[in-house]
UniProtKB/Swiss-Prot annotation:
It catalyses: guanosine(2251) in 23S rRNA + S-adenosyl-L-methionine = 2'-O-methylguanosine(2251) in 23S rRNA + S-adenosyl-L-homocysteine + H(+). Specifically methylates the ribose of guanosine 2251 in 23S rRNA. Keywords: Cytoplasm, Methyltransferase, rRNA processing, S-adenosyl-L-methionine, Transferase. Transmembrane segments: none annotated. S-adenosyl-L-methionine binds at residues 197, 217, 226. Belongs to the class IV-like SAM-binding methyltransferase superfamily. RNA methyltransferase TrmH family. RlmB subfamily. One of its GO terms (cellular component) is cytosol. Gene3D superfamilies: 3.30.1330.30, 3.40.1280.10. Its main location: cytoplasm. InterPro entries: 23S_rRNA_MeTrfase_RlmB, Alpha/beta_knot_MTases, Ribosomal_eL30-like_sf, rRNA_MeTrfase_TrmH, SpoU_MeTrfase, SpoU_subst-bd, tRNA_m1G_MTases_N. This is 23S rRNA (guanosine-2'-O-)-methyltransferase RlmB. It comes from Pasteurella multocida (strain Pm70).
Length: 245
């Protein structure tokens, strides 16, 4: 079993973080791209064979997605679970976690991973059910973050939140449009898990019930909500601002 990744950032990040899992690389024949050439040079330096193919072949392998002239077939990584999360948190003094409840669009998952990496999130937690997979699309949108931010899939999200609270003393903050306390009125400087719900539906009932606090993003215009990846960025960087203050 293998996975495909495509795009300059995604393949480059994979090469930097897990070169041993690269099976084969395909590149567009005759393409003169200053952004692509350093990656091709590094692949050559490491002795990784590149198969140069025409656009029709590469488009077909990338299933019509924008590939920027390169794609790779790779061995899938081991799926991380609750035990891996527990091990990770043992080495964290003031962890920041992102929890995505019911986010099923791989574009949104990739965008959230990219933002999580920029904000210093130590892991992203998702439920095994009703959650986007880490597809080639998600990896490309993540621009390399999918290879460095641990993605933890848990069987029971409510139970995981409870263990974060009781075992690791992490404050669980959920986002909800109707919450009276806003993001900017809330102290978010300690060990924290930020929970983002699906667009339109929000968090599931059990997830909401396991939050220590609910907060909202104040909205001044006529729209009632933001895209989940945009809302995630707004919340995470307010947390970053508070931690740097």
């Amino acid at each position: 079993m293998s996975e495909n990744i495509y795009g300059i950032h995604a393949v480059s990040a994979f090469l930097n973080n897990a070169p041993e899992r690269l099976i084969e690389v395909y590149a567009l024949k005759g393409r003169d791209d200053k952004r692509l050439q350093p990656l091709l040079n590094e692949l050559h330096r490491l002795g990784i064979t590149i198969q140069f193919v025409n656009r029709q072949t590469l488009d077909k392998k990338a299933e019509g997605e924008v590939h920027q002239g390169i794609m790779a077939r790779v061995q899938p990584a081991k799926e991380l679970n609750e035990a891996d999360l527990d091990t990770l948190l043992q080495n964290q003094s003031n962890p920041l976690l992102l929890v995505l409840d019911g986010v099923t669009d791989p574009h949104n998952l990739g965008a959230c991973l990219r933002t999580a990496d920029a904000a210093g999130v130590c892991a992203v937690i998702v439920p095994k059910d009703k959650s986007a997979q880490l597809t080639a699309i998600a990896r490309k949108v993540a621009c390399g973050a999918a290879e460095v931010v641990p993605l933890i899939r848990v069987t029971n999200l409510a139970r995981t939140l409870r263990e974060l609270q009781q075992k690791h003393n992490i404050w669980v903050v959920g986002t909800a449009g109707e919450a009276t306390n806003t993001l900017y009125q809330t102290q978010l400087t300690g060990g924290l898990a930020l929970v983002m719900g699906a667009e339109g539906e929000g968090m599931r009932r059990l997830t909401r019930e396991h939050c220590d606090q609910l907060i909202s993003i104040p909205m001044a215009g006529s729209v009632s909500s933001l895209n989940v990846s945009v809302a995630t960025g707004v919340c995470l960087f307010e947390i970053v601002r508070q931690r740097l203050a």
